[in-house]
Each structure stands twice: as structure tokens, then as C-alpha cells.
Amino acid sequence: MIKKNIFTIFVAAMLIAVIAPHCQAAYTSDWLANTFGTNTTRVGSVARSMWVAPEGVIYTASMWDENEGGVAIYANGKSIGSIGGHGEFQGGAITGNATSIFTALQYNAAYGSGTVGRYGRTSQTRDLLISVSATTAEKRADVITGLATSGSLLYASDFPGNRVRVYTTAGVWQRDINVSGPGALAVDGAGNIWVAQKSAGTILEFDPTGRPRNTIQMSTASRPSALYFDATTVQLMAGDEGPDMNIKTYNISGTPCLVSTFGIQGGYLDTTTGIKGQVGAKRFTRVVGIGKDATGNLYVLNNPWGGTWDLGRDGGTDIHSYGRSGSLQWKLQSLNFEGVAAPDPGTDGAYFYGGTNIYTGSAGGTFVANTVDAIDYPSDPRLNINDLGRGEHFGQLAAVGANRILVAGGQDPDNFYFFHFNAANGYIAIPDATLPGAAFNTAARIREGFCLDSNGDVWAGLDGTNAIWHYALTGFDASGKPTWGAGIPTPIPGTIKPLTRIIYLPESDTMILAQGIVGSTDWTSIGSRVEVYHGWRAGNTTTANPVINITSANPKSITATGNYLFVGYVHTVPNIDAFNLNTGSLDATLTNSSPDTVYVGNDVDSMYGLRSYRRTTGEYVITKDNYNASSVVVYRWTP
């Protein structure tokens, strides 16, 4: 009997040993940067215009939403559906009436650009196309920059045509009103048309026949970006995305005059009521939509700063609802279409830095700050519409003493932008350098891997050099601006060519190199081989141990911290595999611990879409780009 019990215990022990690699240590799935976490409840991506129905139903337009229609519908602080395809709309203008929604359409081979689509609010299908502009070949910029309805009439700003076009809501042209650079529109109770000229800081009034009437001349720095006529008060509300970052209200019963403002003067850049860059109630960024419902609730659509030529990735969705007293009632917020936020070592992983925004918390978290200051730093590359990237929304972060270095990049970048922070500028990321660029004395693109390590050093695989270049951080000046020394090259080990990813962990002097796909010209993809070099700076640049063999298909993004390498995949599974850097073994696969509350998306379709940090408690925090749900997935894992 004793022998039998011993044998049973032995067998049980062997079984435990066999299955141990497949057992999962405890982990949780969470999310940031979206008010809601599931695919059916989430807030839509990058709303750039808004119309509010009298009953309080909100319609927003976006150029792109991966998992729903580009016109999102909300009521009472929740998503209630969407209209159209995910790439059907331009996003820059929307309006409606009791039966229909009118919105600018994205360029299409069938009808080009400059077209408005009419959609039934009940049927949620398109029933009319209205060709507004002679500019039909524009594939990027907004051609139609304003829409409004009044009674049986539809008004449309044809920006390149320098005119406001008037149609019936059935699409029959009535007349044109000549206006240079027309933008947002509103129609008052008498049928007068108000037209914003954003770059000029003016709002023009025309009578119903198109004859000029009054002009509201705002300050030279003002940029009227949204208009709304309040029939109850007979007042015109104008969103200003200039330095004031607020909403201005004008009495238009006679000669227009400014009667009040709504929102903190300076918006998110104000330093008297908060930290510069801090968003929140009445701390507006770009006000791109204003509306009221029949009970007097005010709705404000912000479009946080940050975006290049791809207007589907320009800012994010940020809707505020305010009661009649002016108090905030709720917010609906989402990440830019695609991006990731890196855990901040300076707060032991409590804060997360994206390419343009900062977040904290859990279960959607809190949108803390927009780090782009378009007023003081208009040349910030995150605002450059001619940038090669489609938006610099992927953040990498190093905390060195009291200083932080932020690196922003795109979905599949071969150039990177560097920023610093200081007390005077609060949460604003101050532009410093570009790689490639003068600060690093190179014009070579980064096609063979990039890493900002935890010491602030930079490691880069410069295209065509057959080397891994190390730029050591030499220090910070009095303003917090970092500088780096001359690059020192190390030949790429022959066993890992073509090299595609670099990660260096200075705490353990460990270099991690990932191979691309042998024989392929796609420098953005990862193959199956990852080499781990312990003691790299101590001289071991030739002997990898372990060598990790990735057996799952299509690895795309990797990140590492502590004792683990984390791997995400594209076009296959949303899983994150955790490989042990000492043994090379696959120790865990993170999938979804809370599928009822968190949607983790399909995959990772970005080169640097994973970030990680090991907290002082030993807990690993891994963040993942979730372009399917306009959010950031957060895994917390303790091996």
C-alpha cells in the first residue's frame, strides 16, 4: 500500500512537471483610452464633426473606424449604433434634420471627392448623393468643410470652390454664396447663414438670398472651428481652436456682440486651474462640434491635437455633455484609431504615455493630458500634414531621474521623434530631435530596429549600414532637453540577418535581436528567430543564448522587460506570448481574462504596438495597440 501511494505521488509529480509550461500564472485583462471596453459598447474612432438631434441623439462622423460605421450614434452617454461603412465618410462635416443625416463622403472611385451623402435616420442607409464641389480628385484633405440644414434647405461649404452651396434637402441646387475659405456653418431662425472663415478669424452673415450682412471679427489669433445657433436664446455659439480654446457666444438679435464664453480661457493649456496640457471639464482642445438638445443640455466635441495627413488618425473622440447649469454630466472618449501607450517608470506604471496623450487608471482609465501644444510649438512633427507617417501615436518612454524622454512613432515607422518635459510646460511634450536627423548625424532610415532603453540611450539599425548603432545619453540641459553622444556601431551578427527589431535591457545588459523574414523585402515583419545576448556591452556580441524559436504565425511586435520577451501577432490571434529570456521557453500566453468586459481586438498590426514594464512589486504591465476598439489593452501579469 505504501509503495502504491509513493508511485501515485510520483506519477502526479511527473504530470505536474509535464503540464507546468502550459499553466498560466494569474493575469488580468484591462483597457485604457476608451470609455467602454467591449466591441458593442465602445466609443467610435476619431470623430471630427457632430450633429445633435433635439431629442439628444448624437451623430458624429469619422474618416475611419475599423469595427463599425464611420457615423457613430450616441444617446445618454452610451453608444447606440452606427451608420455606413468603416471607410465611407470624410469625417469633416455632418448635419441632420428630423428624417435624415447629411455628411461629407470620403473620396471614392465612383464619385470622387466633394460629395455629400444623405442617410435615413431610421433606415440608416444612404438614399441620395449630392455632388457639391468641382474638386473631385482630392483623396486626403477636407473638401466640404461645413454642413447645415434649415427647413427644406441644405447648406454646404465648398472650401476649394470658395463658396457656400445651397440645395434643397432633396439635392436640388438653389444658389451659391461666394465666400473665401468657408468652414463651419449655422443658420439662424430668420434663415440667415453664418459662415466661419477659420484661418481669418471671422464669421460672416448672409441673408437668405446670399447678400452680405454682418461680420464678426474675432481676434487675429482666433480660429472659429464650429458654429451652433441656439434658437431659444437667439445666440450664436462659436468654438475657437485658437489660443482661447473655448466657446464664444454672440447675441445676434441686432448687431452681433460677444455676451459670454464657455470653457476655461486657454482650455487644456491653461495653468491657473490645472497643469498645462491637462484635459477635463471645460478644458477644451480643438472644439470641432457644438450642439444642444431640446432640454438645453450642451454637447461639445473636442478633437485632441495630433495628426498628420491621414485624417482617419487625426486626434481622437472626446465628447462632453454639460447640463443647463454648465456642470459636466458625462464624457465619451476614445483613442486615436491606432496607437499604444507606454507604462511610465517614473510612476511605477501608474501613468501611460502615448504618442500624443497621457492616461491613467483602469476600466477605461482617465484621459489625463494632450501633450501637443500647437500654439507654442506649431512645428511639432506630430502636427505635420506632410509627415511620412500616418500619425505619430505610438509612444515609447524613458524616465531618467526626474527627466522623461518621449519617443513618438507611427504604425510602421522608419523615423522617430524625440520630446522632453519640464515643470514650466507641465504635460506638454517639447520637440527635440528626429532620427534620422542632425542630432544623430545620420540621414539613414531606421529599417533594422529601434530601441529607447530605460537609461535613455538609443539603439538603432540604420538602413544599409549592417550595424547596430548605440547613441549614449550624455545628459540634460537646464530645460530638460536631452543630448546624445556620437553613434557607436556594432556589426549585426550574421545569424540574425536580416535584422528587424532591437531591444536592449540595461539592467541586465541583455540585447534581444529579432530576425526579419529571410528573402523578403518587407522590413516591417518579424520571422521566427529571436536571439538573446546576455552581457552585450560587456563584450558578448556574437554568442546568443538562448535562441527563441517563435512557432506561431506572423509575429509583428515585440517588447521586453525584466525576465521576459512578449510577442504579439498580426492577422492571426490577439494572443501575447511570454518567453523566458533565460531559458527561451514559452512560459505563458495572455489571451483575455475578462471577455465580458474587455474586447482585446484581433491582433497587433504595428511594429511597436506592444510596450511593457516590470513594476517594483514584480508585476508585469503589458500594453497593446487595439485598433479594432480604438483603445489600449492592458495586461497585468505576475509570473
Feature locations, PLM:
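Blade-level signature of beta-propeller repeat domains, shared across WD40, Kelch, NHL, RCC1
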Residues: 340-341, 352, 358-361, 602-639
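Conserved beta-propeller blade signature
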Residues: 57-60, 100-103, 154-156, 192-195, ...
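Short glycine/acidic-enriched loop and turn motifs that connect beta-strands
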Residues: 64-68, 107-112, 161-162, 200-201, ...
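Beta-strand-rich domains and repeat architectures in extracellular enzymes and scaffolds
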Residues: 38-67
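A short loop-to-beta-strand structural motif that recurs across blades of beta-propeller domains
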Residues: 69-73, 114-118, 162-165, 201-204, ...
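Repeated scaffold domains used in trafficking and secretory/extracellular systems
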Residues: 46-49, 88-96, 140-148, 181-187, ...
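Surface-exposed loop and turn segments in beta-propeller and other repeat-based domains
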Residues: 28-41, 83-87, 125-139, 217-219, ...
